[in-house]
Amino acid sequence: MLFKAIRIIITICSLVNTSCLLASDEKLSQTDNAVDLLNLSLEELLNITVTIASRTEQPVSSAPSSVTIYVRQDIQNMGFDNLEDLLNFVPGVYSNRDDVRGQRTIVRGHLTGDCSNGILVLLNGARGNNARCGGASEHLSYLKLTDVERVEVIRGPGSAMYGSNAMIGVINIITRKTGNEVKLSVGSIGYKEAGFKLTKSFGDMDASIFANYSEDKGDDYEPFYNYFGEFISTKDPRKAVDITGYFNISALTLNTTFIHRKNAEYISSAGGFGDLNDNVHGENKRFSFDLNYTMDVSESLDVDLYLNSHFYENVWSSIIIPSGLASQIIWTNGAERDSLGGNTVEGKELQLGIIGAWKLSDNHTLSFGSNYRKEKIDRNSFHGNYDNALLFSSNGAVHNPLPEGQDNIGFFGGVFGIPFTPNEIYLIDATSRHTYGGYIQSELELSNSISLTTGLRYDDYGDTGSNLSFRGSVVYIPQDGTTIKGMFGQAYRAPSIKEFYGEQAATGAIGNPNLAAETVDTVEFSVSQIFGATQVSLTWFNNNFEDGIQIVQIDDVVPGTDTFQPRNVGKLKTSGWEAEIYYQLSENFTTKVGISYFDKTDEVGAADTIAFWAFNYHTERWNFNLNGYYRGNVLAQKSDADTILNDTTINSYAHWNAKIRYQITDKIEIYGVAENLFDEEYRNYTIISDLPEGVPMRDRIIKIGTNWKF
């Protein structure tokens, strides 16, 4: 499959190259003066600045980390709808669809844990991960890129700057601060989207608001067998609301964000259930405000004070036991009704901090920062369609379902071998966590061609212990167009509240108060070289993980039920190569290709070969983009001596997309997008153990739309 994809790429390059030689030299109008990485010269590309690597602005070529950047114009040209789409075009990284609630990110051959908690996600520099599961994908699923100015990605450790969860990656999403625009779009599977951006200035004050709504009716999927042997059909309708606000006066900046997602039906992680009646769904809401005050203390010292806070609510519902079996083992009256279950999680976070940069001399900068963070989740109760009033009146003897459409809050036993109790059995009790941290970093230019960065961060989690993270890098630029980097970084992930304090045995899982943080030591070497109109980058990495947290089966806590608990399971090593080629054939045509090969990966669930490609051609008013990615074979389930006779492998596939944009005037644009251009049917790996064949992906989707600037 990979060689077939490469042959297609070569053929397209040949065809497009011929047409480019005859094409006009005129450029697509850039009415908003946005940077377009796919159309920059190689020299301009090297001078693009980033802030994610050191929290100070610096050219990407000299950043002390492996960094990938996508800016607004690239996002528009390539047709990325959400963050998960974009991550498939970052070297060493790809995104897998997991269940109804969203996707999971795999970085450098390593799965990133529950709700991708091995990656730190920042929104305008503010922490986006939540305390319950430790990651961001639970409440930032399918994060829209409509109002995003740029996305910066660290491929590798970032804990020496950012603390916990920045273990194998950091993503910073920066929203737009200016623009006046209306967007409308429609498409197949009932897709609809409408949004606007409005910016106003009042003397020294600048303010903007963005609002966007999108929905679709979902794709229809072929029936499949779930854990209980049922042959079922499903869909995957989605709804999304995004609202962002920006306010700036002098040195004070406020960013606000509201995100609402409802992803329904599809497949549940509890038994691999599909559904067509909204019994399976995930609904997430998140509101955040981030306040920042910048002080120019002196010509050599800049300090930022910040206050970040976010509130979130996650609602999840699933079929627990299908009706046929529930009538026998759950319902006292033998009702032919599904046993439903779920929960609602509410939480909040407050963070106060200071970051600064002190220019000691022309060639030496000292960066520093400290922060306090309080994370809190409310009591996490079980929701189900059990008649609790009848359960209480019968002292636990009768367990019948409620009428259709009704549910109760609270679990009191009486089923699954768990004795009835008048006291509610919580999934997680109300819990709070306090964290203190601080870092210091030195950036020293030893000469015109060599720079040295060293940094150290200390974090103290009141419940799970403390951690010290070190980083060091040397960047050598012997001549224009050549960059050599050597990097070492330590990173960690503190156990989440869910892992540490635990869900009760009623759910088949319990927490582990003895968990230690999982850690990683990473070594990287990279070389970037310009050859005429071509830039080639090659990166080698080696990750040594310690105390990795995994879910393991333990002795029965409740007789007759399987019980699972997170444990520190020891060591793991991943290593591999990332290659990226950027080729500028002419002023109008550019290509970008990335191939990553991992010689050591997680044993199950990670592809050893991935690739991506993007071809962009533009004239004065037209822009054509063809892009795609390749995923190698994935071992989804290993054989054992008892029940699994053979390994299960998910086959490789190539996924293609296309987008055409036409600038009618400087203010009005129309476009068309095709996702999964060749309408291929394929599956990707999921952690749902009951579905070793993987979960299905969407068929071809066509969208058309317009952007109107005013």
Q: Residue spans of the language-model regions?
A:
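N-terminal periplasmic accessory domains that precede
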Residues: 83-86, 103-108, 119-124, 138-141, ...
